[in-house]
From Swiss-Prot:
SUPFAM superfamilies named among the record's database cross-references: Nucleotide-diphospho-sugar transferases (SSF53448)
The protein's name in its UniProt record: Glucans biosynthesis glucosyltransferase H
HAMAP family, sorted: MdoH_OpgH
Keyword Transferase among record annotations: yes
Residue stretches spanning the membrane: 188-210, 545-567, 597-619, 626-648, 708-730
Assigned protein family: Belongs to the glycosyltransferase 2 family. OpgH subfamily.
Length: 862
């Protein structure tokens, strides 16, 4: 682990310039000297502190260090009886921070601002990481699920005198219906008619392919599954066709981006909070993206309307320390004190939605809007200001969701997914907007939210009941959109708005890990399908959320039953009389030409949207995607890859759905934010059974009927090569090689936006982050962690005993044996943390146990 630049732990003990190492035995003076060397002070300041401290050679280490901290804090005799005097390391917090950040570094043209330290009414030193609270009440309404609960509520209304709805069902938007709502209803009826007509035609064709045309019970089940799956695919097909027509010929007159002019002024009272909820994320990546977004917004000239909040739920003490240090460095680099804030939540309640709720309760009264970013989000200043302008121009809009563009990854898998979302995504988002209008999706990030109705209507109560599909809502975004629309506020997708970016999972296994959480969350959300007041569109969103994962076991069952039907016709004599009192036999019929036609039609439904997307890009200029030929070739390779990956996803999603219904727990971990590659051992463990299943399935079908294996080869073949597919698609070298060949190119790679270039630059130049050990040992990091905390009840004798016991326990256990909970307790208590800091420095044994390895190496070299 590297030390931060402000740390002096690697300095050689000696004179002020660090030229001559001291070889004398450890004394009180030498310990104090080492501590002074760990502070980034000029030689004159160190010499003055030595004189002021008045350390005697006979002083014990603890006494010498206490004198040094009192000298740092400029304590007089009257102050030594105060809390600062009894914990001298706590009293010196301000001086230590001033030593690191208060004096301009040599050679800097513009000195970075010092952290604004203050004393509260109790005289405690504090570095404010958040603005003054403007608290709001945010109370969730309990869910009413099922006919029994709804009947009880209706009876309660009857006896209470009237049938007036409860307050949360009353729309309070200035325009709860709007003309677009009736247009949207007609459009969705058209979509439903197209889906039904196409599904009926395909189902009839499927029945004509089967030997008994659906009269056999096994065939009837297969036809029913086919109809359900084809209807699901048909919805996406018509959405893409509609998006193609919009992008190729004309836009939608109801598009939300037409609600305000690009130069519309932003009122002074239209304050917006840009919030980034994080939990155990890559700290350097988080703050690099935040800084790039801040700088882009600053260039627009509208920075005064926005504040930034990093809302941390991190439970790792090392990451917690790194976050605070990164926040301080970003604030100094941007002069962002008072505009960039950091809040760490002690109790992680309701995961991400609870994190947002906590912000709304603390500071919701200060802002009109809130823009939610993910940990990997980057947004341009133009996009941010445009969102506020659109909110001002559409007073009935509750949420406006952008369509984030994926960029920034180098693995082959991620680059294929980036290409797919960049090329095909615009068709689907434009089509989705056409069908849904102001009753659309919210994806949880890169969106702007009107805070007043969000606070009033979108608090999430736990889902009642027992089991894994009850309790705290995991996938909160769809539910919040449904609640917002239930209150009469519109939810829009600004699909034509540029400047919104995110990152993709680097490999197949990481994407599937994310899918498991989403699967569980969508299955939970479906329990809210019958909750009163929801708009039919959002009930349909709950259905599509479930079908995104339930379609996998249905497809798997369809394939298994098709194999069983093959075995039945191969191993069992055909039945000619399948109905009672049947006079004439039913002859089994096989029509390979009809099967081929149905296969071609299904392939058209699946792949035509990809071809149409390429046609649109050809018309608009394919150079941004590597050229016309490379674009077409990339589309073909991506289509082949999607065919190979689909059966693998099918088996994983089948397992996820089964696990959710069986009550298996899901651990919500932050996804990787770097180009993580899949190792062979991980691939064999996760895909080994898939390979065996593919081999066994292929052997069985070949034994039953070799000609049928050709029809099943896309499935069993993909399972057989799943290990190779997972490993090689995660390779960074292959991804970069494809870029050299101009394959899977996207505009963000051909000509990267300024925001993404800035993010990568800040990530490369990010200083090393400290960990929990340095929060205890390093004078500067310790001062920072103490300054951002609050010394609660400093004079309570019982708490003083608890603090003393906590410090003694930490000294006895050492950093490696302390639990994360114990470390977080220390980080949350400035008095205990500063006392531990002093105790560790007062003992050679404890200092050796707590110092990082490279600092020990430097010390040994001295």
């Amino acid at each position: 682990m590297e030390l931060p630049a402000t740390s002096g732990l690697n300095a050689q003990p000696g004179n002020a310039e660090g030229t001559t190492a001291s070889t004398r035995p450890a004394t009180a003076l030498s310990v104090a000297e080492r501590y002074l060397e760990a502070l980034p002070l000029p030689a004159e300041a160190r010499a003055a502190l030595r004189r002021e401290a008045g350390i005697e050679p006979a002083d014990k280490d603890a006494v010498a260090l206490a004198k040094l901290h009192r000298a740092l804090a400029r304590l007089d005799a009257a102050q030594t009886a105060s809390i600062e005097g009894s914990v001298p390391a706590y009293a010196s917090i301000g001086s230590r921070l001033d030593a690191a950040y208060g004096t301009p570094h040599a050679g800097t043209a513009t000195p970075e601002p010092a952290p604004p330290l203050e004393h509260d009414t109790a005289g405690r030193i504090h570095l404010d990481t958040g603005p003054e609270p403007a608290r709001r009440s945010m109370v969730p309404w309990p869910w009413v699920l099922g006919p029994i609960w709804r009947a009880r509520r209706a009876i309660g209304r009857l006896f209470s005198g009237g049938t007036a709805p409860v307050p949360y069902e009353q729309p309070d938007s200035p325009d709860p219906k709007g003309i677009w709502r009736f247009v949207g209803a007609r459009r969705r009826l058209t979509l439903l008619a197209l889906m039904i007509a196409q599904t009926v035609a395909a189902t009839w064709a499927m029945s004509s392919v089967l030997p008994y045309h659906g009269h056999d019970w096994l065939e009837a089940i297969i036809i029913a599954l086919f109809a359900l799956l084809f209807c699901w695919v048909s919805a996406g097909f018509w959405t893409a066709i509609t998006g193609f027509l919009l992008l190729a010929f004309h836009g939608d007159r109801f598009v939300i981006s037409r609600r305000a002019a690009p130069n519309a002024p932003i009122p002074d009272d239209a304050r917006t909070a840009i919030v980034m909820p994080i939990c155990n994320e890559d700290v350097q990546r988080v703050f690099a993206g935040l800084r790039a977004t801040y700088e882009s917004l600053q260039r627009t000239g509208h920075l005064e309307h926005f504040d930034f909040f990093v809302l941390s739920d991190s439970g790792d003490p090392d990451i917690r320390t790194a976050e605070a240090d990164a926040w301080l460095h970003v604030c100094r680099a941007l002069d962002g004190f008072g505009r960039v804030f950091y809040r760490w939540r002690r109790h992680r309640v309701k995961r991400k939605s609870g994190n947002i709720d906590d912000f709304c309760r603390r500071w919701g009264g200060r802002y009109r809007y809130m823009i939610v970013l993910d940990a990997d989000s980057v947004m341009s200043g133009d996009c941010l200001t445009r969102l506020v302008q659109l909110m001002e121009g559409a007073p009935s809009a509750g949420i406006i969701q952008t369509a984030p563009l994926a960029a920034g990854r180098d693995t082959l898998y991620a680059r294929i997914q980036q290409f797919a979302t960049r090329v095909y995504g615009p068709l689907f988002t434009a089509g989705l907007h056409y069908w849904q209008l102001g009753e659309s999706h919210y994806w949880g990030h890169n969106a702007i939210i009107r805070l007043e109705p969000f606070i009033k209507h979108c608090a999430l109560a736990p889902i009642p009941g027992k089991g894994s599909l009850s309790g705290e809502i995991m996938s909160h975004d769809f539910v919040e959109a449904a609640l917002m629309r239930r209150a009469g506020w519109a939810v829009w997708i600004a699909y034509d708005l540029d400047g919104s970016y995110e990152e993709m999972p680097p490999n197949l296994l990481d994407e599937l890990g994310r899918d498991r959480r989403w699967c569980h969350g969508n299955l939970m959300n479906f329990r809210l399908f019958g909750s009163p007041g929801f708009h039919p569109v959002h009930r349909a969103v709950f259905v599509t959320g479930v079908m995104a994962y339930l379609s996998a076991p249905l497809w798997f069952l369809f394939l298994l039953l098709s194999t069983a039907l093959l075995a039945k016709h191969t191993l069992i004599a055909p039945e000619y009389f399948t109905q009672p009192r049947q006079l004439f036999p039913i002859w089994p019929e096989w029509h390979p030409e009809k099967a081929a036609a149905l296969f071609s039609a299904t392939a058209t439904v699946l792949f035509l949207p990809k071809i149409l997307s390429v046609l649109v890009l050809w018309a608009k200029g394919p150079r941004r995607f590597g050229g016309a030929v490379h674009l077409a070739l990339s589309m073909v390779i991506e289509a082949v890859f999607s065919v190979l990956a689909a059966p693998v996803r099918m088996l994983f999603h089948t397992r996820f759905v089964t696990a959710a219904f069986l009550g298996w727990k899901v651990h919500w971990k932050s996804p990787p934010r770097d180009d993580a590659q899949t190792h062979w051992g991980d691939a064999v463990r996760r895909h080994g059974l898939h390979t065996l299943l593919g081999l066994g399935w292929a052997a069985l079908v070949y034994w039953l009927n070799p000609s049928f294996l050709w029809w099943l080869s896309p499935v069993v073949g993909a399972l057989i090569v799943s290990i190779l597919l997972s490993v090689f698609s995660s390779r960074v070298t292959l991804g970069r090689g494809m870029r050299r060949w101009r394959l899977f190119m996207i505009p963000e790679e051909v000509r990267p936006p300024r925001e993404l270039r800035a993010m990568r630059k800040h990530l490369r130049q990010a200083p090393p982050t400290p960990d929990f050990r340095l929060a205890v040992v390093d004078p500067v990091t310790n001062a920072l962690m103490c300054a951002i905390g609050t010394a609660r009840f400093p004079h309570d004798p019982k708490l003083l005993e608890v603090r003393d016991a906590t410090v003694l326990q930490a000294l006895a256990a050492g950093p490696d044996k302390l639990t994360s909970k114990q470390k977080l307790v220390l980080l949350s208590d400035p008095l205990a943390l500063s006392a531990l800091h002093l105790a560790v420095w007062s003992s050679d044994v404890h200092r050796a146990a707590w110092l990082p390895a490279n600092a020990l190496a430097s010390k040994a070299a001295a």
